[in-house]
């Protein structure tokens, strides 16, 4: 309901363009790579993200409906794993890029091996936070 209220308030107050940010958790749990926007609704999201993923999926659907019904520029971006300045480098709670940076720093500082966990098989995409800012500015200035 929050997403719909925001879109409707924007429409009623004359906002011509809304850029919404979705999350990669909207993609189906079982999906073939590479991830593309046309795969969003091809299956259930991972159970751990079910409610959040569906609210983000509906934001994309609602934005598309507003474009079609009212001719407004309501678009969605799906940034991948974002990293950059002011990130969380805490090894207990950080995401993968800042955790790897921190582990690398500690290995260098302590003259120990830099160990990366896992099999190396998972595929991940990353994007620098300042690039997300540049992309957002581009989208805001560009007609869809």
Residue ranges and their predicted role:
Residues 12, 29, 46-80, 96-110:
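Active-site Tyr-X1-5-Lys
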Residues 19-23, 78-80, 120:
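Active-site beta-alpha turn of Rossmann-fold NAD(P)-dependent dehydrogenases/reductases
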Residues 33-37, 89, 116:
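Short clusters of hydrophobic/aromatic residues that line enzyme substrate/ligand-binding pockets
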Residues 4-49:
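Conserved Rossmann-fold NAD(P)-dependent oxidoreductase catalytic core, especially the SDR/UDP-sugar
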